[in-house]
From Swiss-Prot:
The gene is rpsL. This is Small ribosomal subunit protein uS12. Belongs to the universal ribosomal protein uS12 family. Keywords: Methylation, Ribonucleoprotein, Ribosomal protein, RNA-binding, rRNA-binding, tRNA-binding. With S4 and S5 plays an important role in translational accuracy. It comes from the Bacteria. One of its GO terms (molecular function) is tRNA binding. GO terms for biological process: translation. Coiled coil: none annotated. The modification 3-methylthioaspartic acid is found at residue 89.
């Protein structure tokens, strides 16, 4: 236990919180251009072909972003919006592509959880 005098001379150091999404620079979303669109495999015990893309952001960062939902229209040079949120079984993927924003279309024929996939309300 430090004495009062020791604390007066050298106060306790504050713990600095490290961001899980440094490329966003404290913004909710960032715009970027796809440099590569590809599939990758998750780590054990899962098995799939996960759709991801490499994105060069407006602030110069180059990050990997996950493309959620069934089917997408992204290719190289597509302009997309990314948000934070990692994919637990894909190492190094710490961002998600926002569906239905900029060049990324919403998920076709989506009926439930539509707001997460950029889909308008269907006509009754």
């Amino acid at each position: 236990m430090a004495t009062i005098n020791q604390l007066v001379r050298k106060p306790r150091a504050r713990k600095v919180a490290k961001s899980n999404v440094p490329a966003l620079e404290a913004c909710p979303q960032k715009r970027g251009v796809c440099t590569r669109v590809y599939t990758t495999t998750p780590k054990k015990p899962n098995s799939a072909l996960r759709k991801v893309c490499r994105v060069r952001l407006t602030n110069g960062f180059e990050v990997t972003s996950y493309i959620g939902g069934e089917g997408h229209n992204l290719q190289e040079h597509s302009v997309i919006l990314i948000r934070g949120g990692r994919v637990k079984d894909l190492p190094g993927v710490r961002y998600h592509t926002v569906r239905g924003a900029l060049d990324c279309s919403g998920v076709k024929d989506r009926k439930q959880a539509r707001s997460k996939y950029g889909v308008k309300r269907p006509k009754a």
